[in-house]
């Protein structure tokens, strides 16, 4: 019977020890000569046999299942367990069962040498597994019932290995070490060669962007501000502007990758995973382009063998050490970041590219855009058509020649764009839409060419990892805003020129109202322009250049640039809808005023006087609203940018003494 017991414990039940799929291994009830206490001891041993049989079934089923799946990946929706992490778990589980198998062999030798040994000896010899097997079975059952997949297996095993039972902890740490072997192989391929070897989608890095887009945030409708102040959400936006998505690292021409945070093991922090993501993306970007480049070497400075050896050393460690792991990742990341810094700052002239961005997107070349506004003024007053874009670019080239900007390498990279009513429909007809566009929501056709004007810039490799399409789109938003302010300023200056031409003629009360309103409008717009150019653009740009020159790390540059762009959008109030809406209303009133003056060079008739009265009231109301918004926030010390704009507008307390209202006087 002892041999029958050893066979049953090895996974081969017989007539004495029977197997039932539901209840497992049990002593047969057909033996009356067995004492109840003996039956109890034997059934206790049978629980070990039950667990062992289920372990071996699990190993055979899923190891074989994985091998079959290599050539036939599972269809989505099948939901079966599969993957190389599962196979590694089975391998580790098999190694943990080896001492149990050896104990049975030793018992067999002992019984052959001494036939008088009792069942109690078997019970004593196998007692060490009575704690181990149920604990490991909990892990196996959890993997099966919850269909745990990929790196989630690491998390499950790790959590159960944190218990206080030494044999259980030791066994699960062995299994975890085998599973980590798979992770280190994937890490080596990703970090050293830019290869994502992940057929079953098990790794914590995936191809494709993460869910959620910034455009949804930017276009989210919020309730407008009451006169009293700002909403809590708007204040949070001001205090915590994180506008650049970390995952938008690569241009669409290259594969995009992102973190799959939901399966990242808890003992690997997200900050370390982001470093791993950055290294792999950078290596892949460099490898993809290296074929076309004459430069020799690699982004890892030919240290692949050294780093591979360090990762292999980590793989050989019986216990995972986050300190050692992060040190190796940091060394690889530092090498990559320094190489990228050299590539971008020294070889690709990043500072020169930023100067181009500032000159064109941020209107640094003011004389160019002044000439362009004069040239294209009449062309863009009407709603755009299919030929407007071509005409505008011709005007832009002519303006560049007028101001002696004849850089043959630069101008072809810049292109003014016009979004006219039929453009999206044509694009839809010619190409399938893969990604929901920002323009899918029905919008009104632009009222003028100015409203539809944008700027595009062809970014050269490798600067595309810094100036992504999402980043350039944000620059475009700033460009449109700055151009609208500059255009209003130019129109008000033109009105002043008209006023000077007629100053020798007799004027009436309406003329006094008209020119005083122009003076107040120019005062507000000039100070807004000064605030944007000096307090925002020049200040932030000089900080950006200082940060770039004080580091040799690409990630630091990228974060500094992200911060720069975030500050531009925040400090120019593009994201603070109450202020932005109020400023736009003021600019629209200025446009209307300039149109009225240009069309009525002489004294205003009754209809013109009525229009002027409406403009005076509107400007008075909007300037009052702006003053109240700026004052309410300033009093709470929440936003220094609003306080700075108020300082520019109210530097001599005229605004305050006028009751926070400009342009309000009797007709």
Curated annotation (Swiss-Prot):
Any one of the GO BP annotations: microtubule nucleation
Main function: Component of the gamma-tubulin ring complex (gTuRC) which mediates microtubule nucleation. The gTuRC regulates the minus-end nucleation of alpha-beta tubulin heterodimers that grow into microtubule protafilaments, a critical step in centrosome duplication and spindle formation.
Lineage: Eukaryota, Metazoa, Chordata, Craniata, Vertebrata
Any one Gene Ontology cellular component term annotated for this protein: recycling endosome
Region named Disordered: 424-446
Record Pfam families: GCP_C_terminal, GCP_N_terminal
Subunit structure: Component of the gamma-tubulin ring complex (gTuRC) consisting of TUBGCP2, TUBGCP3, TUBGCP4, TUBGCP5 and TUBGCP6 and gamma-tubulin TUBG1 or TUBG2. TUBGCP2, TUBGCP3, TUBGCP4, TUBGCP5 and TUBGCP6 assemble in a 5:5:2:1:1 stoichiometry; each is associated with a gamma-tubulin, thereby arranging 14 gamma-tubulins in a helical manner. Gamma-tubulin at the first position is blocked by TUBGCP3 at the last position, allowing 13 protafilaments to grow into a microtubule.
Family that this chain belongs to: Belongs to the TUBGCP family.
The UniProt record lists the keyword Membrane: no
Organism: Mus musculus (Mouse)
Record Gene3D superfamilies: Gamma-tubulin complex, C-terminal domain (1.20.120.1900)
Name of the gene encoding the protein in the UniProt record: Tubgcp4
Name of this protein: Gamma-tubulin complex component 4
GO molecular function, a single term: gamma-tubulin binding
Subcellular location: Cytoplasm, Cytoskeleton, Microtubule organizing center, Centrosome
Keywords, alphabetical: Cytoplasm, Cytoskeleton, Microtubule
């Amino acid at each position: 019977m002892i041999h029958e017991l050893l066979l049953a414990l090895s996974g081969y039940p017989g007539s004495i020890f029977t197997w039932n799929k539901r209840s497992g291994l049990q002593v047969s009830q057909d033996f009356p000569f067995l004492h109840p206490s003996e039956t109890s001891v034997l059934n206790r041993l049978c629980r070990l046999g039950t667990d062992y049989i289920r372990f071996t079934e699990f190993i055979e089923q899923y190891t074989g299942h994985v091998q079959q799946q290599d050539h036939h990946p599972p269809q989505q929706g099948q939901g079966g367990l599969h993957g190389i992490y599962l196979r590694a778990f089975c391998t580790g589980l098999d190694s943990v069962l080896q001492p149990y198998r050896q104990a049975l062999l030793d018992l067999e030798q002992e019984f052959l040498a001494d036939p008088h040994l009792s069942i109690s000896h078997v019970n004593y010899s196998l007692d060490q597994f009575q704690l181990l097997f149920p604990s490991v079975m909990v892990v196996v059952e959890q993997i099966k019932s919850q269909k745990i997949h990929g790196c989630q297996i690491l998390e499950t095993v790790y959590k159960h290995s944190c218990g206080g039972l030494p044999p259980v902890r030791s066994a699960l740490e062995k299994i975890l070490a085998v599973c980590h072997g798979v992770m280190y192989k994937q890490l080596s391929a990703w970090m050293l060669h830019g290869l994502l070897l992940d057929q079953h989608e098990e790794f914590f890095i995936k191809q494709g962007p993460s869910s959620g887009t910034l455009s949804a945030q930017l276009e989210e409708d919020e309730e407008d501000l009451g006169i009293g102040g700002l909403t809590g959400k708007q204040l949070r936006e001001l205090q915590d502007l994180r506008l650049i998505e970390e995952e938008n690292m690569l241009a669409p021409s290259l594969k995009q990758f992102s973190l799959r945070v939901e399966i990242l093991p808890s003992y690997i922090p997200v900050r370390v995973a982001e470093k791993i993501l950055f290294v792999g993306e950078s290596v892949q970007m460099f490898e993809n382009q290296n074929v076309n480049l004459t430069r020799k070497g690699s982004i890892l400075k030919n240290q692949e063998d050294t780093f591979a050896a360090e990762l292999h050393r980590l793989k050989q460690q019986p216990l995972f050490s986050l300190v050692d792991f992060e040190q190796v990742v940091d060394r690889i990341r530092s090498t990559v970041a320094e190489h990228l810094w050299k590539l971008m700052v020294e070889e690709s002239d990043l500072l020169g590219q930023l100067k181009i961005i500032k000159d064109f997107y941020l209107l640094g070349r003011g004389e160019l855009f002044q000439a362009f506004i004069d040239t294209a003024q009449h062309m863009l007053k009407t709603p755009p058509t299919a030929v407007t874009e071509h005409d505008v670019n011709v005007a832009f080239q002519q303006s560049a020649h007028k101001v002696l900007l004849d850089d043959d390498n630069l101008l072809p990279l810049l292109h003014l764009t016009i979004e006219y009513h039929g453009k999206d429909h044509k694009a839809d007809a010619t190409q399938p839409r893969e990604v929901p566009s920002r323009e899918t929501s029905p919008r009104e056709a632009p009222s003028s060419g100015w409203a539809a004007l944008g700027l595009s810039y062809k970014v050269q490799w490798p600067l595309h990892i810094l100036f992504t399409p999402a980043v350039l789109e944000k620059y475009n938003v700033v460009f449109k805003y700055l151009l609208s302010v500059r255009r209003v300023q130019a129109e008000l200056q033109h009105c002043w020129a008209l006023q000077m031409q007629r100053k020798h003629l007799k004027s009436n009360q309406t003329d006094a109202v008209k020119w005083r309103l122009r003076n107040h409008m120019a005062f507000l717009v000039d100070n807004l322009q000064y605030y944007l150019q000096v307090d925002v653009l020049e200040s932030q740009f000089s900080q950006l250049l200082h940060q770039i020159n004080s580091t040799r790390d690409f990630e630091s540059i990228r974060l500094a640039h992200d911060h720069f762009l975030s500050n531009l959008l925040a400090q120019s109030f593009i994201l603070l809808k109450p202020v932005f809406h109020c400023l736009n209303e003021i600019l629209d009133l200025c446009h209307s005023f300039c149109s009225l003056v240009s069309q009525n060079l002489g004294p205003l008739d009754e209809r013109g006087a009525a229009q002027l009265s409406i403009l005076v009231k509107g400007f008075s109301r909007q300037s009052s609203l702006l003053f109240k918004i700026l004052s309410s926030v300033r009093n709470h010390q929440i936003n220094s940018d609003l306080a700075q704009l108020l300082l520019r507008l109210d530097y001599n307390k005229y605004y305050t003494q006028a009751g926070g209202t400009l342009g309000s006087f009797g007709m």
